[in-house]
Amino acid sequence: MGGTKHVRIHGSCSPRFERVRYEFERNFTLRDELGAAVAAYVDGELVVNLWAGSADVDGQQPWQEDTLSTVLSGTKGLTSTCLHRLAEAGELDLRLPVAHYWPEFGQAGKGDISLAMVLAHRSGAIGPREPMHWRDVTDWDLVCRRLAAAEPWWRPGTAQGYHMTTYGFIIGEVVHRVTGMTVGQYLHSEVAGPLGAEVHIGVPADQQPYRCADPVGKPTIREMLASAGAPKRPTSLDDHSKAGLAVAMGFAPDDEIATNDLTLWRQLEFPGTNAQVSALGMATFYNALVQEKLLSRTVMDRLRVLQGGTETDLVLGPRVAEHGWGMGYMLNAQGVNGPNRRIFGHGGLGGSFAFADLEHRIGYGYVMNRFDHTQANADPRSVVLSNEIYRALGVPIRPRRETVYDD
């Protein structure tokens, strides 16, 4: 794999963390980086804030400190935090059924699905029973009606399967019914705005040309499903080993909006999949968690408890065992994202990753625009950077087991 021969690294890096800058540059020279940024706080101090490369494939738009990049499922960490804040404030109860707040959702055997089940990807509500055209997915109410009417794909609470797209719709509808705000509005007014963090779910069209990086090399949903050998329209998860993937990824192809109308996709709100963020924004967000500005330590200790062990995920398969799910966050059960197996955060298809480490007081964010969908949320471009942060803190790093997953 080749890379850029010469790249100018912008930003700042405390002397103790200079190896992060070195590896960040090597991402461009050796690991095929196009445009990217990394930021990290340690004990509340910004120690790394670097960016470089191009925000577009033609090299005409230099990456800036506040360049926004899509993090796809990294959005879930933002959305989960909003829900946990509401729960800690007493505005909702995660143990109650979703139908307590959204009565229509209780149809078709879903009456006992709790918010906690959704957070843990154990509700079975991974998609409706019929596919939707990408234009239909721009209609929030229509999607919610389809989800409310659908039977779960397994008995709620008995198995684990990644709620790839439905996660954002289910939690988003509950947040709206409780607060009167969308998740994007709540995130802006109650979390990101007060922090000054550049993390957004929904970016106005007129801001996108000079703010947003273009995704490069990102496969479409159809390409990924075809590559995985997934069936087109399964009626049961018993139909095919990839039936769960086909349902969760293919039912409501909000990603196909990005393929057909990228501006529209960024402008809409999909609280599970389309946040536009800067690396500094994500590091600021997760640092606020470390500093207990958003949630209490008691809540954070609960949300990072492994849910369902490391059983095979009915959507993503056995590879999930390497990280495992907490209550709305990706964990680090096997240590593929650094030495602390108690971090919590979320990665996104393509390589982005952000996390909070309460033990070592780290808030970390890495974003990029050249996609590599083979690394399953342990992209070497990010892992080498976060590992250097740990090394600077004197934390031993075990050798990384290089893995490319075959679904």
Q: What does each model-found stretch correspond to?
A:
Residues 130, 160-173:
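Internal, well-ordered domain-core segments that constitute the primary functional module
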Residues 25, 99, 123, 148-152, ...:
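Amphipathic, well-packed alpha-helical segments that form the structural scaffold of globular domains
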Residues 2-54, 159, 176-194, 206-407:
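Catalytic loop of the DD-peptidase/beta-lactamase superfamily, centered on the K-T-G motif
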Residues 21, 116, 141-148, 386:
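Hydrophobic core segments within long, regular secondary-structure runs in both alpha-
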Residues 65, 70-74, 86-126, 130, ...:
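Active-site helix/loop module of the DD-peptidase/beta-lactamase fold
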Residues 26-39, 51, 58-118, 155-165, ...:
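Short active-site loop at a secondary-structure junction
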Residues 79-80, 167-172, 281-284:
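Well-ordered alpha-helical segments within folded domains of soluble proteins
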